Regions:
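Alpha-helical transmembrane segments of integral membrane proteins
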Residues: 1-19, 261-266, 295-321, 325, ...
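Interfacial "coupling" helices/loops that link adjacent transmembrane helices in transporter permeases
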Residues: 289-331, 416, 713-752, 809, ...
């Protein structure tokens, strides 16, 4: 074996051009796939940082059984408590969490800062199985009303805000006006759930009649060993049925839906990642096929030498082994360079990915999901190396073991053309490469069309010269609805005086990132849908003047007024799609909407206005508009039994740059107890909102370009070899009167035949792949006629360029030189 390795090294050194092309081909294919695998490994395969994470499930409440899309409702205190009490044979334990923005003071004289806080039940970290890295967990006593105020902080908060103080345990933070003692620091990169910066003990009130049906808890449970998902689903359904029987109010009836913890993060991302993986595998197949074609062409050139060695005693097994060793050596070198390429492009992939964007739908930012070249990635690269080196090197190696000396020497004689078997085999390799390249190009054009449609789709409001930021309005400083409203109004007044600000407004939740804020409602005169009993729409809670400040057109009726106070009749504004859906042939002004079911004891709100439709980050890509219902902030603050989420200020500027410090200063003048965070330009947010689709578009296009280049190299290699072997034929044709143009056309027709076969096969493969992908990702568009035509043109032009040099070489064959051997 060592002698075979030395022989392979000598042969590679003697043929530097062949070696360079083979290594570059493999490096590009393996490097790209290794980088993609690092992303997939970090997102889909890397174990979660919990013991027996496969037993962790997320529980939702829903009005439609077994409907994951309708399972946006969180748990109530009552439901979570019942699951704990009656699910002991299924769950080891059930925990809950809720999210809010808090104002944090460091007791060092610095201004308040906003932070993401998660209130968790005292058993939360026990359920997930991850204790603090420093300090201790919450005790059950600390999750009771009136208990000592404590907090656990994230590693990021400890490092970046508390400056990695060694004496962090026992220090005091003022959270929403309440001094809290730090009792723990969580492990590095742990921010679960909802990218938390700190965790507070959560007090449940399952028997409080005013809050028992507030669905605000994120529920996570650990299954008992041996409990299957099907058994757990059945038990949860039975518990929900029993709970519904005990509560005669049909408005409270709920079903439940469970998902494995990892699945809850990646169920929407998986099919999109699989599209990228498929494109990467296609590029690898082109590279591997090209590699096999290079090896086969090399064997064809050396057939005489190999046959002579066989005649002198070299066994067939020895010849095959030497060729496989050479192929494997090339694969090793190509993989080494591929890993270098992967190490270079992996950070670029992460920068492009949704995980690096605040508005791009990143799903794994609670954990360490950054792609990196670790042991699983190296193992993947080694597996690909072995597959390519041995699998794709076997056929050329078998060809090298042909032992017919006379046939081999005749085939390599001057003027001899390629035999039919070699010609067909090499042509088959090129057709395969062209087919895969055609599929990739078609997918790339389709992705381009889809991405362009997304970015050109209007938001329904203006994003130009709009700045947004979130604020925390803590109960500790603002205990009443009037206090909260006064703080927000004073802040608006101060912000409107900032130079460069033309208008300022407030809304909850964020106008762009609210696709998760679905509300349940019924419209007067419309039958309740079955079986859920409710419709859903996006919720908005703005101040008067919000729609004008955002440039969202008022189509009918009026905007909210200052007189729409807590004591005034309840009013709402609906979007155009809601109006058309429920009152298509009449004016919606004066109609009424009720939150929840029709038979629920809740007040009606009167529709006073209709605005244009708008979209939100995370909307389905099929163009369906869910609709929006807005309620005035003053009425919601007075009536809400749960806090408003993501209270967002939006500033409309005259184009002048306004700094974060200027905004903070204006807020501090209005009220020093308001803390702001998460400043962003709405234009930037709009650009980042399609980070997932952009990621797919960029990578599929990159792989299509890579496949196109490799396919062109493969076609060039085949035509160059055939032209070299057909010099005698071209010489005879020239001697008999064939012009250079006719000979070029002869080579071009051969190229066109291969291209036609390849594109036809690629079209069939694309059709099958699209149907497969759309089973998992319904929004994935099918290629249209324009996509096919564009792919055909690009592929045709590239192949014309690849065939031009061999065709010119064929046209310049000197008949005298070509026939001299005769």
């Amino acid at each position: 074996m060592l002698s075979d390795l030395r022989y392979a090294l000598r042969m590679l050194v003697k043929s530097p051009a062949f070696t360079a092309v083979a290594v570059i081909t493999l490096a590009l294919g393996i490097g790209a796939n290794t980088a993609i695998f690092s992303v997939v490994e970090g997102t889909l395969l890397r174990p979660l940082p919990f013991p027996h994470a496969e037993r962790l499930v997320v529980i939702y409440e829903t009005l439609v059984e077994n409907d994951a899309r309708a399972a946006a409702n969180a748990l109530s205190d009552r439901t979570l408590t019942r699951f704990r009490e009656f699910g002991r044979d299924i769950f080891e334990d059930v925990a809950g969490a809720t999210y809010r923005i808090v104002a944090v003071g460091l007791n060092d004289g610095s201004p308040l800062q906003a932070a993401r806080a998660t209130g968790v039940t005292s058993n939360f970290f026990d359920v997930v199985g991850l204790p603090p890295a420093k300090g201790r967990n919450f005790s059950s006593e600390e999750a009771r009303a009136g208990a000592s105020a404590v907090v656990i902080v994230s590693d990021d908060f400890w490092r970046n805000t508390l400056n990695r103080r060694d004496d962090v345990l026992g220090r005091t933070l003022v959270v929403d006006g309440t001094p809290r003692t730090i009792i723990g620091v969580m492990p590095k990169a742990f921010r679960y759930p909802i990218r938390a910066q700190m965790w507070l003990p959560l007090v449940l009130e399952p028997n409080n009649p005013t809050t028992r049906n507030n669905h605000y808890l994120y529920g996570v449970a650990r299954l008992r060993p041996g409990v299957t998902a099907a058994k757990a689903e059945g038990a949860v359904k039975r518990m929900c049925a029993a709970s519904n029987r005990d509560d005669p109010d049909p408005a409270n009836a709920r079903a439940a839906y469970m998902l494995p913890l990892r699945e809850s993060f990646v169920m929407d991302l998986r099919p999109k990642l699989l599209v990228i993986v498929a494109a990467a595998v296609c590029a690898l197949l082109i590279a591997a096929t090209n590699f096999a074609g290079l090896l086969l062409a090399r064997v064809v050139e050396r057939e005489g030498e190999l046959a002579l060695r066989a005649a002198l005693g070299a066994s067939r097994r020895r010849l095959v082994r030497q060729q496989l060793v050479q192929a494997l050596l090339l694969a090793v070198i190509g993989t080494a360079f591929g890993l270098l390429i992967a190490s270079w492009i992996t950070p670029m992939l992460f920068a492009l990915s949704p995980e690096a964007s605040d508005f791009g739908g990143g799903v794994m930012r609670e954990f360490d999901s950054a792609p990196r070249l670790d042991l699983p990635v190296f193992a993947f690269a080694a597996g690909v190396m072995a597959l390519v080196g041995l699998g794709f090197g076997l056929l050329p190696a078998m060809r090298a073991s042909r032992t017919d000396l006379r046939a081999a020497i005749s085939a390599t004689a001057r003027g001899a053309t390629l035999d039919r078997g070699a010609r067909r085999l090499l042509a088959s390799f090129v057709v395969i490469e062209l087919a895969i390249a055609a599929a990739l190009l078609t997918a790339s054009v389709t992705a381009t069309q889809y991405f362009r449609k997304l970015i050109e789709e209007p938001w329904g409001f203006e994003t130009k010269d709009r700045l947004g930021f979130n604020v925390a309005v803590p109960d500790g400083f603002f205990p009443t609805a009037m206090a909260k409203q006064a703080a927000l109004e004073n802040s608006l007044a101060q912000l409107r005086t900032v130079p460069g600000v033309e208008s300022a407004t407030v809304v909850s939740p964020s106008p762009m990132g609210a696709s998760w804020s679905l509300m349940e409602f019924n419209a007067e005169g419309a039958p309740a849908p079955e079986p859920s009993g409710v419709y859903t729409a996006y919720a908005r809670v703005p101040v008067p003047g919000y729609f004008a400040a955002m440039g969202q057109p008022l189509l009918q009726g009026r905007d909210f007024r200052e007189s729409d106070t807590a004591d005034a009749p309840l009013v709402c504004i609906v979007s155009q799609s809601i109006a058309k859906r429920f009152w298509p042939n009449e004016s919606p002004i004066g109609k009424r909407i009720k939150w929840g079911r029709l038979d629920a004891e809740r007040p009606w709100s009167t529709v006073v206005g209709v605005v244009g439709d708008s979209k939100a980050i995370g909307d389905p890509g099929d163009g369906e508009v869910p609709g929006m219902i807005a309620r005035p902030l003053s009425q919601m603050l007075a009536q809400a039994t749960a806090p408003l989420f993501n209270i967002t200020f939006v500033l409309h500027t005259n184009g002048r740059a306004i700094t974060e410090a200027t905004i903070r200063s204006a807020l501090a003048r209005a009220n020093p107890n308001l803390a702001a965070r998460n400043f962003w330009s709405m234009d930037d947010a709009a650009a980042q909102s399609h980070a997932t689709e952009r990621f797919i578009f960029v990578l599929v296009s990159a792989f299509a370009f890579l496949g196109l280049v490799l396919a062109a190299i493969g076609l060039y290699g085949l035509l160059a070899l055939q032209v070299a072997r057909r010099q005698r034929e071209f010489g005879i044709r020239s001697a008999l009167g064939a012009t250079a143009r006719q000979i070029i056309e002869l080579v071009a027709w051969q190229c066109a035949a291969l291209l036609s076969l390849g594109f036809t096969a690629g079209a069939l493969a694309t059709y099958g792949m699209v149907r497969l992908v759309r089973n998992q990702w319904a929004e994935m568009p099918a290629p249209n006629f324009i996509a096919w035509i564009c792919a055909a043109i690009v592929l045709g032009v590239a192949m014309m360029i690849a065939s031009w040099l061999p065709a010119r070489r064929a046209a310049r064959v000197d008949p005298v030189v070509a026939l001299r051997a005769e």
